[in-house]
Amino acid sequence: MTVKVPPLKCQGIKTKLANWIKDHSTYENNGTWIEPFMGSGVVGFNIAPRRAIFADINPHIINFYNAIKNRKITAGSAKEFLEHEGALLQKHGEDHYYEVRKRFNKEFDPFDMLFLNRACFNGVMRFNKKGFFNVPFGHKPERFAKAYITKITNQVKYVSQATSQYDWNFVCSDFHQVISSASQGDFIYCDPPYIGRHVDYYNSWGEQEEQELYELLKTTPAKFILSTWHSNKYRTNSAIEKYTYHFTILTREHFYHVGANEKNRNPMLEAIVLNYNPLTPIDLQEEKQLSLLEKKQREEYLLYSTPSV
């Protein structure tokens, strides 16, 4: 199934994992779809829930999507803006990029956010200790070709249509409050920052936050999926052993292309943590019948399954 790509990119975006995550979701549009760590929003955008709360601690992400919801940003206005700024970028190169970055850090205009997100280095979304966007230029002055602008405006158009059709709310909030608001029948999708990776002003993340998140998820009446990483060739995620023994874990190998650090470009075994068993009795029987060789050849496999609900 074709994945609907969001207009804002960010490191760790789950575009290539969205269908895999969606396939293991039991959300049936009866409750509210809740994302405490919206980021790009790609998973929720592909679920297309009737009711959703997309939350993030980064106000610039929330302001951008509220600008689409409130029709400040439309496909037409985004096209016009990117054509204008793209022409200036092609003419003046990095000087124009840094001029827009300076302007954004003063005015925080969501149009500038879109431009910077698509013109910066590798689509990284990073803010310094003062809360200012500080990603360098991506060194592609010809970035905003006609086809590329059309691609972005179509992405804006999808979100605009979805916010007209569905009850989607974009809120700037801490994950504690968002998860605590969930009720039975709701579905939570969590994509928190990874410890030690992509840390900045808005997404610093450590052991304490990781523990608090899992404690909240252990007690929520809602079903959830949490995206995390399991291991790479250097190390294993210690949180998997510490906090997930109550839950089901599925894994899949994935390769991230975002990040300047070569160490962060290695293949990684991604994991999703669930508080339910997504496999049917038939699936479980087939799982038992797989040979060891077949298991190794499978793209995803069940590590262990002891769901709490």
Task: Label each residue range with its predicted role.
Residues 55, 173, 227:
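The conserved SAM/SAH-binding core of class I Rossmann-like methyltransferase domains
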Residues 206-309:
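Long, positively charged, glycine-interspersed low-complexity recognition regions
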Residues 40-43, 58-61, 119-122, 175-178, ...:
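Short, solvent-exposed loop/turn segments at secondary-structure junctions
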